[in-house]
Regions:
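A preference for well-ordered globular domain cores
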Residues: 2-109
Length: 109
């Protein structure tokens, strides 16, 4: 989810309601001589946990049905059950997305 702020937001903010917000891709943008901050963010509950944040980021882009579909189509193609060259491309994009998330989380939590 994209969010906009008037001041640079923190990467991790813990709220009093038992949830926390993790932000990444934080960048300063200037529009009509007004500076704002834009970032991607997800809200999770409980104590801050990298695995929860990773899953929330994945679910922000891929619901479980779509994720399983990509994996199943790739496996079906690899095993020769179906011929679907797009399955390899879609699975590779998905794996690159997961790698990007890992790189984001390695930058700091």
């Amino acid at each position: 989810m994209k969010a906009f702020y008037d001041q640079q937001p923190e990467r991790l903010t813990i709220d009093n309601d038992g949830t926390y917000v993790f932000r990444w891709n934080i960048e300063e943008i200037t529009e009509e001589e007004r500076t704002q901050w834009q970032c991607d963010e997800v809200r999770c509950s409980g104590n801050p946990d990298i695995d929860k944040v990773k899953l929330a980021i994945i679910r922000d882009s891929y619901d479980a049905d779509r994720e399983f579909s990509i994996i199943n189509k790739y496996n079906s193609h690899q095993l020769g059950v179906t011929v679907n060259p797009d399955a390899v491309d879609n699975y590779t994009k998905y794996l690159n997305f997961l790698k990007e998330i890992d790189n984001i989380l390695l930058q700091g939590f």
